[in-house]
């Protein structure tokens, strides 16, 4: 199963273009991002990034996941907003 942290990481890597920048934007360390990506790749069973020196490039599978991550995270935020409003 993919958790929201994994989705947020893939979205950040897609937007930032590197593990270091993604880590900075999310408040993680670069090694933590690397470890989370490896774990996510293991769960999915396919590479999500191609490492090229200090930059990374999303594979086709990584691009698909990052694109859907944006949608899923937006829907989750909307759901939480409506749930909070309903509780008031």
Across the structure, where does each feature detected by a protein language model lie?
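Conserved small/polar residues in nucleotide/adenosyl-binding loops
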Residues: 82-88
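Short, solvent-exposed amphipathic helices
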Residues: 61-75
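A short, exposed helix-loop element centered on a Lys and neighboring polar residues
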Residues: 77-80
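Short helix-boundary/capping micro-motifs
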Residues: 12-27
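A short LG(V/I)-centered, amphipathic sequence patch enriched
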Residues: 41-58
């Amino acid at each position: 199963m993919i958790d929201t942290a994994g989705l947020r990481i893939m979205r950040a890597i897609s937007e930032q273009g590197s593990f270091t920048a993604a880590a900075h934007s999310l408040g993680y360390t670069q090694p933590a991002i690397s470890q989370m990506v490896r774990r996510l790749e293991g769960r999915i069973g396919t590479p999500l990034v191609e490492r090229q020196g200090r930059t990374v490039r999303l594979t086709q599978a990584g691009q698909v996941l990052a694109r859907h991550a944006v949608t899923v995270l937006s829907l989750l935020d909307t759901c939480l907003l409506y749930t909070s409003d309903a509780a008031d």
